A protein has these predicted regions:
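Charged, glycine-rich intrinsically disordered N-terminal tails and low-complexity linkers that flank
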Residues: 1-46
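Nucleic-acid nuclease catalytic cores
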Residues: 41, 57-82, 87-142
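A generic secondary-structure signal marking the coil-to-beta-strand transition
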Residues: 18-20, 51, 92-94
Length: 142
């Protein structure tokens, strides 16, 4: 189970249902394949390094990647493919999760007049923290 699966399991994901996840894990092709969204997904992947660089410049924190799949030591079914890590001034490490969105989804990042992380992304960050045993996760959204 990867971090993006958590919001589908909790029923908070606007992108996939628990049934989609079930079919995905069994390698069963989904009846309604989301081919129309491939451009947005590809742009998100292409923009990740730029967004990480923006975060690094704005915060002054060192940002780096470890390209591997992390696995929880006690629960091997818990996996995490972390976008980036952040070296904080006190020497500790945090997670940096990169998100890209569009103008129509901007309201998902606000609640009661305050900037917030959507619950479906928050669950992803919490999953990453559980797998990596880190206690801080930054989200940077473009």
């Amino acid at each position: 189970m990867e971090s993006a699966d958590v919001s589908a399991i909790f029923g908070t994901s606007p992108f996939r249902t628990a049934r989609d996840l079930y079919y995905d894990k069994l390698n069963i092709a989904s009846v309604e394949d989301d081919e129309g969204n491939w451009v947005a997904m590809e742009m998100g992947h292409l923009l990740e390094p730029l967004v990480a660089k923006i975060f690094e410049r704005k915060t002054g924190y060192r940002v780096y990647q470890i390209k591997k799949m992390f696995q929880h030591p006690q629960y091997p079914w818990m996996l995490a493919d972390v976008d980036y890590f952040v070296e904080l001034p006190d020497g500790t490490t945090a997670i940096l999760e990169i998100k890209t969105t569009n103008y129509n989804a901007r309201d998902n990042w606000w609640m009661n007049g305050k900037e917030t992380v959507p619950v479906y992304y928050e669950s992803q960050g919490r999953h990453y923290m559980a797998v990596t045993d880190l206690d801080r996760c930054f989200f940077c959204c473009l």
